[in-house]
Regions:
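Bacterial Sec-dependent N-terminal signal peptides
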Residues: 1-28
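Alpha-helix capping and helix-coil boundary motifs
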Residues: 11-15, 133, 265-267
Length: 523
């Protein structure tokens, strides 16, 4: 039993006080919480695809991110070896590409073969050289150990979309021959395909039906998704399920809780924490729509673009083409403004804890959410900042690494009794938790977070009715402020370190703005 338990505690923590002007209400001087793990009840298996990533041909995600031919840090093929090494730490199981709204002007045949066809993406104001195409994407995925997930241009013809599936997966025929001529005789075996990105309307839904049918005729083993919801509205048009439901395996859901596309926002830590329960409510609303359509269990959720913050891309809607003169001072200024998303000071402990909150929501809904892709994985708002001379691991990089590497295979019920953290008219639970266990039922990993910016929380951890007790090793992600961040000058300001942590009669102290993952081995 628990008398023989061995606990290794790994914690993502940051340490001191919030800004003096922050107004936080709590019920008592010593905040308290209790976490009760249902250790003897049935568990459910989650899909590690929830730790996926997304890359788009915008904002130095690919060019100047993963792919930088001529860089001293790149190999002969142009892949940044330092970036690949870092992302492999995250065990990213799936990468979605090439968009995003960028895909609305993307035609895959221009990005294969020796003679690539550059073009001007006038929806986003991007000059696309097409040197990174299907073959390069597949090679990147193979190097990362990730499955490729291709998002189709739904404005293209149905035939063009079906042909891309054939180019990637066919073993015989003209597109298999074309792929072999371009250097890859073996099929790529791409499983995941999306019909379009962030589209709505019955015309789109009809095209989803016809395209999904055509793609599955090429390869019946593929898994097909389409646009379900994007933005704060999570309800789904019932016509989608009625018309295309039988062809769908996944439903694409997108949300960025701080919209930055046209106007740039940098809310404080507490404002960000007030958003940290939104993923739970968003997922619940999507599940409700699927359930009402009678397709819960058949169609799963792919939350294939998510982040606390969206990137800044002013002056371009991504939907309407416009004439772009790249010598125009106004266009130059708009393109320059995109770099605001790269500002290191944006990515604080708020991002680290929101990231954990999002994963907790996915894990709680493991029966319904089978994929999630942080947007994006490098540069812009991603966990890894890439610059010409190296990389910086942002705060949420460490959250992702901890979750991807430490959690066990199954999710158990965890009841959390916690005070509320209040800011203005909003509030969230001060403490959140998730519990996972391995196949044997003996090895547990329990994640606990304290969202309070400046107060420790006295937290009781119980496995059923039994209390965890003793002094245990811990890995702690420490910072000197909830607003701490990593940058080129101080890349290790927020990073893990080992400490000793005490549980006395089940009680430990959760530091301010912290996430703690506790490993429990029951012999």
């Amino acid at each position: 039993m628990l008398k023989q338990a061995i606990l290794n505690i790994v914690a993502l923590v940051s340490a001191l006080t919030c800004a003096a002007e922050a107004k936080v209400e709590a019920q008592s001087t010593q905040s308290q919480a209790t976490i009760i793990i249902a250790a003897d009840e049935p568990t459910k298996t989650y899909d590690p695809m929830i730790f996926g990533g997304f890359i788009e041909h915008l904002g130095k995600q690919i060019y100047g991110g993963f792919f930088e031919p001529g860089s001293p840090l790149a190999d002969a093929k142009g892949f940044r070896l330092d970036v690949i090494k870092a992302v492999k730490e995250l065990k990213v199981p799936v990468i979605r590409w090439p968009g995003g709204c960028f895909v609305d002007s993307y035609h895959w045949q221009k990005g294969v073969g020796k003679k690539r066809q550059p073009y001007d993406d006038d929806r986003w104001g991007v000059l696309e050289p097409n040197t990174f195409g299907t073959h390069e994407f597949i090679e990147l995925c193979r190097r990362l150990g990730a499955e490729p997930y291709i998002c189709q241009n739904s404005l293209a013809s149905i035939q063009e979309m079906a042909d891309w599936v054939a180019y990637c997966n066919a073993t015989t025929g003209p597109f298999a021959e074309m792929r072999e001529k371009n250097g890859h005789p073996e099929p790529f075996n791409v499983r995941f395909w999306s019909v379009g990105n962030e589209k709505v309307g019955r015309g789109y839904i009809d095209k989803v039906r016809d395209t999904a049918e055509a793609m599955k005729k090429v390869d019946e083993s593929i898994l097909v998704t389409c646009s379900g919801s994007h933005g704060p509205r999570a309800d789904i048009d019932p016509y989608l399920f009625k018309t295309a439901g039988k062809y769908l395996d996944l439903l694409s859901v997108h949300e960025y809780w701080i919209p930055n596309l046209q106007e740039h926002h940098a809310p404080d830590y507490l404002s960000c924490m007030m958003l940290s329960e939104k993923p739970d409510t968003h997922i619940s609303a999507v599940v409700k729509s699927i359930d009402e359509a009678g397709m819960r269990g058949q169609i799963k959720i792919a939350f294939d673009e998510w982040n606390l913050r969206s990137w800044h891309h002013p002056g371009f809607s991504g939907h309407q083409p416009r004439k772009v003169d790249y010598q125009d001072p106004e266009i130059i200024a708009l393109i320059k403004a995109r770099e605001k998303s790269l500002e290191p000071s944006l990515y604080t402990m708020a991002d680290a804890l929101f990231c954990a909150s999002f994963y907790n929501a996915c894990l709680r809904n493991a029966d319904d959410v089978t994929m999630a892709n942080i947007a994006c994985i490098v540069n812009q708002t991603g966990p890894l900042y890439v610059h010409p001379k190296g990389i910086v691991k942002r705060t949420h990089f460490h959250t992702m690494a901890m979750y991807a590497n430490m959690l066990k295979e199954h999710v158990a019920k965890a009841q959390v009794k916690s005070e509320r953290l209040t800011y203005g008219s909003s509030s969230v639970a001060m403490v959140d938790a998730i519990a996972t266990v391995d196949e044997s039922g003996k090895k547990w990993a329990i994640a606990m977070m304290n969202r309070h910016p400046s107060k420790e929380v006295s937290c009781t951890l119980k496995m059923g009715e039994l209390l965890v007790d003793g002094i245990y090793e811990a890995t702690v992600l420490t910072a000197d402020s909830p607003d701490a961040y990593n940058d080129i000058e101080s890349p290790n300001r927020v990073m893990p370190k080992k400490i000793a942590l005490t549980f006395k009669e089940g009680i430990t102290s959760l530091p301010p703005h912290s996430l703690v993952i506790v490993d429990v081995l029951i012999e």
